[in-house]
Design a protein with these regions (language model features):
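Short acidic, glycine/serine/threonine-rich loops at helix termini
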Residues: 11-12, 82-84, 140-145, 340-344
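Condensing-enzyme catalytic core mediating Claisen C-C bond formation in acyl metabolism
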Residues: 1-42, 162-241, 252, 346-348
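Acidic-glycine-rich active-site phosphate/pyrophosphate-binding loop
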Residues: 21-30, 81-94, 142-162, 217, ...
Length: 348
């Protein structure tokens, strides 16, 4: 396996957000654990981030673009409504005319992508796969032009009162998210390493835990000024219920997949959990009875990058020497849909 990441250079700290909404560093960190996040510049989207991460992963794996015959792209923030990002990333990276498809499982997108790629490798439909999760959340941040100018350092203030009020109304979710991408290269192995088990779940009855109700084709027109003014084109979140379901679902998925292959929590060397919120990650570790060193977190530095949290964190753990040969790694995520699950990976 090779891994790679891509991150925008523009870092926005909690102190920066204080300038454009009614919040504080203490308020944000105590509720989310986020200290800073990155935002893409205008004109940069998740396609560019994904392409950079894929190229880095291929280089890390020593694999040429022409050897790849499957690309799975996970994002909830595509560059355009249609086509999806997958074909655009394929072209940007210079891959052949291969099977490239996109999935919309939000925070669980990379996890679902791993399982899909592993299945296609196992049945011989692919020999070399790339899975990438990439997000550019800046596009739906509730900031107006004056606020963006202040965050980018091109305007000293004061804040626009209407923009300040609108951003404050959305602070429960907007302080969480950041932009970034992570990718991995997978090949079919001949031994008992690689992905050895997985369990995926969905529950549409919980769709409104976090969702964007506007911009849908049940509406005519599918987007209009009224939706924008009503805030229907930005996320709506039921934070407490989301927390409760996530801290139950992820540990249950991990123990379930361990049971299915005859292993236990004590066999785990590392848990790569979706970085939704520092308290959620901590609660997952507690529920599994694992030390925080086994369930690491990087949300303080990146925020919640949805489909990119798993590959970015795994890449960082590889660089830190935490992913040695033979190590047993559990990937787990819970996100909008609701979609969740867990996968077990034995490092070759």
């Amino acid at each position: 396996m090779g891994t790679g990441v891509a991150q925008p250079p523009h870092v926005v700290s909690n102190a920066d957000l204080v300038k454009v909404m009614d919040t504080s560093d203490e308020w944000i960190q105590s509720r989310t654990g986020v200290a800073r996040r990155r935002y893409v510049a205008p004109g940069v989207g998740s396609v560019q981030l994904a392409a950079e991460a894929v190229s880095a992963a291929l280089n890390d794996a020593g694999v040429a673009p022409g050897e790849v015959d499957l690309l799975v792209n996970a994002t909830m923030t595509p560059d355009m409504f249609a086509p999806g990002n997958a074909a655009l990333v394929q072209a940007e990276v210079g891959l052949e005319r291969i099977c490239a498809f996109e999935i919309r499982q939000q925070c669980s997108g990379f996890l679902y992508g791993l399982e899909l790629a592993d299945a296609m490798l196992a049945n011989g439909r692919a020999t070399t796969a790339v899975v990438v999760g990439a997000e550019a959340h800046a596009g739906y941040m509730p900031f107006g032009p004056t606020s963006w100018a202040m965050l980018r350092g091109t305007h000293d203030g004061p804040a626009d009162p209407d923009e300040y009020a609108a951003a404050t109304d959305s602070r429960a979710w907007s302080v969480l998210f950041g932009d970034g991408a992570g990718a991995c290269v997978l090949r079919r192995g001949e031994d008992d390493s690689g992905f050895i088990g997985g369990r995926l779940f969905s529950d549409g009855g919980s769709y409104d835990l976090i969702h964007v109700p506007g911009i849908g084709f049940s509406r005519q027109p599918y987007i209009d000024a009224a939706q924008l003014e009503a805030g229907l084109c930005i996320p709506q979140m039921k934070g407490m219920e989301l927390f409760r379901q996530a801290v139950r679902a992820m540990p249950s998925a991990v123990t379930g997949v361990l049971d299915s292959v005859g292993l236990s929590v004590s066999d785990l060397d590392l848990v790569i959990a979706h970085q939704a919120n520092a308290r959620i990650v901590s609660a997952v570790g507690t529920a599994l009875g694992l030390d925080e060193s086994v369930v690491p977190s990087n949300i303080a530095e990146h925020g919640n990058t949805t489909a990119a949290t798993l590959p970015i964190l795994f890449h960082e753990q590889r660089l830190a020497g935490r992913v040695g040969s033979g190590a047993l790694v559990a990937f787990t995520a819970f996100g909008a849909g609701a979609h969740w699950g867990a996968s077990l990976y034995r490092v070759p």
